[in-house]
Amino acid sequence: MSQQRDALSGDGDPALWSPRAWLGPQTLEALAEVNEQCLELLCEQAQAGARPAAPLLTELRALWIELDSAARRRAARCPYLLLDAGFTAPQRWAPAATREVRDQACAEPVAAFFTVPRASAVMRLVTTYAWHLASSQSAAARVLLGMSASCAQHIGTATLGYVSRLAEGHAQWLQPRWADRVMVWRDLLSTAASGEQAALERSRIRGIQLLAADARASRIM
């Protein structure tokens, strides 16, 4: 299926996140590449069968295992990051000048979702992409990553080295978006596997609606 067809809505009109829209093709292509790595990580975690495992992995294990590269590419073209790294928790990304407050927040326990070795590399990839967007396209970071304004400010004004060090020390921050909404993921994976464009588009739109609802609930937009 061509990228041109993939950028069309169910009615045959260009989607709001198509390369012709305000976000631009390079930003969206990079997002798709990051998402593909995120999906590969989820597939690997599901195959690992670690215990205790989250319902997102156990209930959808067959879908994760059967998700081939073509299906992953289709699912990866969602116009939002499929994982999160605490981009609505500004205290995690606060400057070193406020280290005491930041360290207290960072000390709060966060259960690691990912236990496979690949998680650290994906965490670095996600945070590097987040830093790039926050420092050059703050509005895009907030839309595509569900990032709060204060997080965008902290990450966008920090050095890449500082953000990378935080990421290396806190790989457990990396979590699936909507990890407790198994049906949302079931819909995305099944439609990506089928390749049915209209159904896949509806799944993407549902994700956008959820992201917007989360933003309103957190007052981050």
Tell where the protein language model's regions lie, with residue ranges.
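Structure-specific DNA junction-binding interface
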Residues: 1-99
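Short, charge-rich amphipathic alpha-helices with coiled-coil/heptad character
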Residues: 99-108
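Long, compositionally biased
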Residues: 72, 169-211
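Amphipathic alpha-helical packing elements
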Residues: 119-171, 175
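Membrane-interacting alpha-helical segments
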Residues: 107-125, 173-184
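Generic amphipathic alpha-helical segments used as scaffolds and interaction surfaces in large
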Residues: 25, 29, 33, 110-117, ...
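Surface-exposed polar/charged interaction patches
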Residues: 45-49, 133-136, 169, 191, ...
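Long, low-complexity acidic/proline-rich regions
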Residues: 214-221
